[in-house]
Structure formats: C-alpha cells, structure tokens
C-alpha cells in the first residue's frame, strides 16, 4: 500500500478502518483479485501460494494464517488472536487477548480475502463510524462470513523490542 498520508488525509487516524479507507482509491485501481493484510511486527518466511489455494478450495470469504503455540508471552505488546476451529478448518470463534486461551491456534497477523470483500467491509464499517478492523469487523463477522484458518508450521516471531527484532531475524 502507499503511505496512508495523502493530500486529503494528514496521517491522523481514528483507527485501521480510517487508514484503509484513506487508500481505498489505490486498492480499487489494483487489478489483483485478492488482498493479503499482514502486520508489521510479525516475522515469518513463507509464500502465500498454499494459503491462496486453500482459500479458493474452501470457498472462504476470509482466511487467517495461524500457527500452533502454547502460551502468549505477557510482555508482548500486541493483540493476541486465538481461533476456535472446526475439523475442516472453519473458524467457529475468535478470542482477543484471552487470559486463559482455550485453543493453541494463534494468529500470525495475516488475513486474506477477495479485494471486493475487503472493499465492502471497509466501506460498510466506515459508514457506521467503526474504527478498528479487527474488533469492529472481523470479530463481529465470525458467524456471518465463511472464515477459515490456514496453518503455518514455520517459525513465527512477534517483534516487541529491539533485542526481539535481532533475535527473531536470526531465527527466521
């Protein structure tokens, strides 16, 4: 994506929905069918070919990349998302920052969907005054949209400090 700061938007946002909405013209002009959103603080090494193939095969509206972890480290400053998954990989529930996670399926902070789905979700949320894509859109749409998890078995690290940045880059 281009920088969120534009002639019409000075870079002060009310949240992720506002930020995505500010670059919607760029997104609409893109010829790509799919959009993949990834956080800037997560480190992993993968291509998305298998994730895209599963997304198409399952007919998912949204696919989340996840890995299997034990406990969340309390010193990590970013949101932790845990998924309840059916046997076929369909997301049946999402927990945000659970104190006692009920599942080992932890988000890698990557979400994929068709560009038209993303455009609709952002425009709809923006028109209602929603601010956070995770809380106001994804968490609320679990039973409404067809969401699946794609398991990633490689190394995943969450950068929350300068030493963490170096350690995760060495480990990747």
Give the residues covered by each predicted segment.
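Unchanged
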Residues: 1-170
């Amino acid at each position: 994506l281009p920088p969120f700061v534009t002639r019409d938007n000075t870079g002060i946002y009310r949240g992720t929905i506002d930020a995505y909405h500010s670059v919607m013209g760029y997104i609409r002009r893109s010829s790509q069918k799919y959009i993949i959103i990834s956080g800037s603080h997560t480190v992993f090494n993968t291509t998305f070919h298998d994730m895209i193939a599963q997304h198409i095969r399952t007919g998912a509206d949204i696919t989340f990349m996840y890995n299997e972890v034990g406990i969340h480290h309390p010193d990590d400053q970013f949101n932790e998302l845990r998924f309840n998954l059916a046997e076929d990989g369909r997301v049946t529930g999402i927990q945000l920052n659970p104190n006692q996670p009920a599942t080992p399926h932890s988000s890698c902070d990557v979400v994929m969907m068709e560009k038209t789905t993303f455009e609709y979700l952002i425009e709809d949320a923006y028109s209602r005054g929603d601010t956070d894509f995770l809380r106001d859109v994804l968490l609320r749409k679990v039973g409404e949209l067809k969401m699946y998890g794609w398991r990633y078995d490689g190394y995943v690290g969450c950068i929350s400090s300068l030493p963490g940045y170096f350690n995760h880059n060495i480990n990747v």
